[in-house]
Amino acid sequence: MAESAGKPQASKSKTEKAKVEKNRAEKTDTSRAASAKSGSSRENAGVKADDTVKANSGAKISAGAKAQTGAKANAAVRPEAVPVDFAADPTNYVNRELSWLEFNYRVLSESRDKSIPLFERLKFLSITASNLDEFYMVRVASLKDMVHAKYAKPDIAGLTPQEQLDRISERTHELVEMQYSTYNRSLVPTLRQNGLRMITEHEDMTEEEAAYTDEYFRKNVYPVLTPMAFDSSRPFPLIRNKTLNIAALLRKKSGEDEELEFAMVQVPSVISRIVELPREIDEDGKERRVVILLEEIIERNMPSLFLNYDIVASHPFRIMRNADLTIDEEEAVDLLEEIQKQLKKRQWGEAIRLEIEDNVDKRLLKIIRRELSINSQDIFEINGPLDLTFLMKMYGLEGFELFKAPRYVPQPVPALMNEDDIFTNIRKGDILLHHPYQSFDPVVNFVRSAARDQSVLAIKQTLYRVSGNSPIIAALAEAADNGKQVSVLVELKARFDEENNINWAKMLEKAGCHVIYGLVGLKTHSKITLVVRMEEDGIRRYVHLGTGNYNDSTAKLYTDCGILTCNPQIGEDATAVFNMLSGYSEPLAWNKLSVAPLWLRGRFLRMIRREAEHAREGRPAHIMAKMNSLCDKEIITALYEASCAGVKVEMIIRGICCLKAGVPGLSENISVRSIVGNFLEHSRIFYFFNDASPEVYMGSADWMPRNLDRRVEIMFPVEDEVLREKVIHILEVELEDNVKAHILQPDGSYEKEDKRGKVLVNSQEQFCREAILMAKESADQEDPARSRVFKPVMSSN
């Protein structure tokens, strides 16, 4: 939380921590000579000396950066390779894709939890559906591409691409079955009991409801529809990715021709899929709302689309297509133009998944399967409405606020409540931000204030994902209009945000900003803003560094951390980062920051191995790490070695985890938990005990090959003692969570912690309470009268 609130009670002194850690430390496997002391190795981070990464604007990063010592020890080096005994056995690792599916099961478990408000359960079920869509469009599509290319190299868990596809299909069919069991057997009946009837089949309508929907169809739907036939003169219709369609088998009413015809119609996305009917009175005399899905109305009225034909069978269906972009950046003359071309192809990629009703006419299914070239393992026969993402729209229905969690309002940051000038506040000391518990407004205000401050000379920022009506973009454009030097790296390759980012890039260029499209072969995923300001004592650099995107919308839903600072060394590093991104620059070393792809992997490995060395020497050793995903084999193997050396390793990993935890002789000192709650856990935090001199870092990178090797990422230290204790407090509270945490078991499954006899700890709710309390205390100190009119922060709106 913000630095003005003092140290949390949960934090322990260095002496107390040392005693606790010493009691847990074990000296094992002392013969592992390959583990080196911190900083002892000087290899060059796994990149050949002549390798370079060229920027689209002409910048390049040289892998020949030389290691330096002293204050600049964090150079482009890599520790020696880890021993191969753990790495050689694929059974020591979990397949990435199967691990992701287990994460989606954890999200699904929230929709099955009856202690959660009903409409929140709808939301979680919708999220599992949208997650699965993206998983198929990207990950499954990539595996299919490998199979087509006859690529059969096993992954870290020893599975070939085809073996992965087979297991994914099996596990996904089980997941989908559980999704619809939850929907049909739990959610729909519970909705009905609480005043909302879902008409699941159009045959179930009353006469009045049928008449209403028929009139609705005639006035609002029929004019929009385009029925499409398939015969020798008309090819099979092109079906866009993720669209909902209704296929039909037809037989002509007149004549003796028994031949069946195939036709289809797309369910229009321009009309709301959820149609509300007149309210009804239930068995108890209470008013109840009634809704039906648009495809049910269309299916009921199919005869009006195919006059003089009998509808033999009709079934909704939906396909998923390969949406993974293939861009040859080296050959592209204009990266922006090339991405725009590829985006047009995304809607028409290879069909990789088919959803259709479970009672489908097999003759109709045969036609669809043949024309789309769909494998049997990629066909999902569904017992319920296709595409459960509509439940997110259901969540938005008004009148059901009692069945939703109270809306949390992000709190003001205490350190920024007493001064109007944000730069004055930052000069007083580094400021820690913890979103969404604390407001994202200070980040927006930082950029906006810089745009309007006459003393500001330049603003530089990286953008990966921003909101649809971004105040950050508006502030950058305003800054350029005010004559400031504005440089923005807009990452055009941010998946599924490519089109938005292209539009923002064009707008910023028109506003007079210098826009960089990213680096060839790399994604720029770092979150950094640099403001250069002329002050009485000369130039001062202000920096924001964060773990999450500059997106004011998702900042209300994702848990992230950030720091505002004017530390001169961080400012110098920030300048070097932007010089590296925008021009010809070859940083040899860094003062405070660690930057991927050349420097970050080696930094992490050295710190992990340092803890292992301390444990072997009989000293306390402890690692705490929080991230979205862990699937890097080299990092995992280093953690296994640390565990065997006696290092206690505690990790909070929301999503993918390819590490096996709690396995004797391998990882008995490693624990992993995944927190799934109202907010999406997104921050990356790393703690190393370091012989009772703890080091704490935050950053944009997960422990994944893509983050460490193929992206520009930044890790930054938290050096202020008070702020460091607060970040440690975040980790400690999440490690105590026994309400929303799922614990990884040695067999790879996840289980909720046994709460019997324990004080319940919901980390997200605790952070909400802490933020409310700190903001109130700060407001009361500023003006005691405000304590009587303090704004409530929990709202049902």
Write out the residue ranges for each language-model feature.
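N-terminal localization/anchoring segments of enzymes in phospholipid and broader phosphate metabolism
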Residues: 2-623, 641, 645, 657-797
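Cofactor-pocket helix-loop regions in the catalytic cores of large enzyme subunits
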Residues: 628
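Hydrophobic alpha/beta core scaffold segments
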Residues: 648-652
